[in-house]
Amino acid sequence: MLTYKEAGVNIEEGYRSVKLIKEYAKKTMSEYVLNGLGSFAGMIELPEGYKKPVLVSGTDGVGTKLDIACKKRKFDTVGIDCVAMCVNDILCHGAKPLFFLDYIACGKLEAEVSSDLVKGVAEGCIKSQCSLIGGETAEMPGMYKEGDYDIAGFAVGIVDKDKIINGKDIKSGDKLIGIASSGVHSNGYSLIRKVFKNLDEDFNGKAIWEELLTPTKIYVKPVLSLLEKFNIKGMAHVTGGGFYENLPRMLSKEGLSIVINKNSYEIPEIFKKLMELGVKEEEMYNTFNMGIGFVLCVEEDEVEEVLKELSKQGEKAFEIGYINAGGEGVCIK
């Protein structure tokens, strides 16, 4: 008689995976979590101190960056990417991350690999000050090839209703501050994999695949600190679509546009390398973060103090542009 295991689903390996994963998830639990992993659902109570609490949610994945991780069997950092992609998005509206859920899919489950993936997720949650309260691991033979994995995440945060950041107060003359990225982050990898045929080629003394698997930076701690001290009018997480698609998302009014000075900071070597290998500059700004992973909009008279505060927190940040009256979209000059 045919069994589930013979059909390609190993329940025992699933149990072993859960046992390994639980140890990492435990390290992320806050005082607000009401139950541990293993229940049908995760439960968390809302923190006190919010007058009109609003829940802010986001979901994302890591895209084809995972293809490099799968080829090089290096899975312990892409979980950080997954968390970063979600929490940086909800952060744009002023939300403090509360909890996170993950979803892992594969063709054949290997407990050590799923454990490495969740190890990264847990590390990302700790960096984001949120709890990993649940998830799902799906073994799907026939849907995925053996050795292939995918990961997605779901983040929920909280913000007071009157502190939601939605760009409504942004005006002409406001300045834009860019916080440095850690590298390519998690977007543009379908293009990258076409450009870099040999993942083992040297890049500044290490294999290019090592550079490409550098985890996406999580901006939660420095940005939440800024929100307590300054009037941050708008924020943008520079992800898929680069500058052209993401920066206008912080604007809620028509009649405003964004001007970026591309010479205001040094573009990292990895992006210069991509341009050397044939990717046009406009395509670069339309695909990648170009060294700036997160952008803040502030009043002109707060620029210097915001930059000082970010420097104190160990972040590289630059005044990269301004809000312009008239026009639309983004002008990079």
Swiss-Prot record:
Keyword Ligase belongs to the record: yes
Keywords of the record: ATP-binding, Cytoplasm, Ligase, Nucleotide-binding, Purine biosynthesis
Pathway annotation: Purine metabolism; IMP biosynthesis via de novo pathway; 5-amino-1-(5-phospho-D-ribosyl)imidazole from N(2)-formyl-N(1)-(5-phospho-D-ribosyl)glycinamide: step 2/2
Location(s), subcellular: Cytoplasm
Superkingdom: Bacteria
InterPro entries found in the cross-reference section: PurM-like_C_dom, PurM-like_C_sf, PurM-like_N, PurM-like_N_sf, PurM_cligase
Predominant location: cytoplasm
Catalytic activity line of the entry: 2-formamido-N(1)-(5-O-phospho-beta-D-ribosyl)acetamidine + ATP = 5-amino-1-(5-phospho-beta-D-ribosyl)imidazole + ADP + phosphate + H(+)
One function term, GO molecular function aspect: ATP binding
GO BP, sorted A to Z: 'de novo' IMP biosynthetic process; adenine biosynthetic process
HAMAP family attached to this UniProt entry: AIRS
Family: Belongs to the AIR synthase family.
Stated name of the protein: Phosphoribosylformylglycinamidine cyclo-ligase
High-level lineage: Bacteria, Bacillati, Bacillota, Clostridia, Eubacteriales
Gene: purM
